[in-house]
Each structure stands twice: as structure tokens, then as C-alpha cells.
């Protein structure tokens, strides 16, 4: 068996509606399903090939995810930076790193760090850290 890739990412969030606004209106993900009356309330969004589900954290659930960072590939990180600043998203300016990518960083309402990266080439994308 081989792993083909990341098919689904689920984040537990403190406020589903606030996070939904951040990911859809500010970052540009498309809402494909929103079930605010489910247990827990959830929403699924799509961005490129990534499917992202946001689940409202309930007190009965274990808290997870702190210290987790996400690297999401974009075609043009500089263009995406301009789009985010036009939407008044707090975003760190593009930075080139020695590991082979140019990236920007944002934090979602639950303090998950999201790195949007444009890789210099396929070998940089495939590099193991």
C-alpha cells in the first residue's frame, strides 16, 4: 500500500461561523457543505485539491491540534499575498527560504498557522525536512 496524498483535513475550531468566514471570505475556500445543526456542527470547504472540514469543538471532545502547521501550495504566492491584504487579512509578507520555497503565513481564528507556499521547483517540493 502507498499513501497517495492528503485527502481530507479536519480542524476542530472554537467558533464554526467565525472560522467559516475566515476560510471562505478571507482565504477564498469554497463552501461545499455546511451542517450547523449536526453534532458537532461542521462545514466542508474546498480549495484546489484540498478538502477541509471545520468541526465545532465540543467540551466532550479531546482538544488536539496545537503546534500543528499546514503548508498549502499556491501557484503564485505574491499574487495571493496581494489578494489577502486587499481582504484585510493579517498576513506576513512573502519570504524566500533556503528549503526551496517562497511563502506567506497567516493564523486562523484558532491560532492554527497556515503557510501558503510557491515551490521553486518540484525537487524543492519533494524535499524531506
Segments and roles (model prediction):
Residues 35, 56-57, 127:
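Conserved catalytic-core motifs of eukaryotic protein kinase domains, centered on the activation segment
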Residues 10-51:
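Core segments of cupin and vicinal oxygen chelate
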Residues 51-52, 58-60, 122:
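Active-site/binding-pocket entry motifs
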Residues 45, 52-54, 106, 116:
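Generic preference for hydrophobic
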Residues 2, 5-14, 32, 43-46, 61-129:
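Vicinal oxygen chelate
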Residues 35-38, 60-62, 97-98:
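A short beta-turn/loop motif at secondary-structure boundaries
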Residues 1-18, 68-70, 120-129:
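N-terminal beta-strand motif that seeds the catalytic metal site of vicinal oxygen chelate
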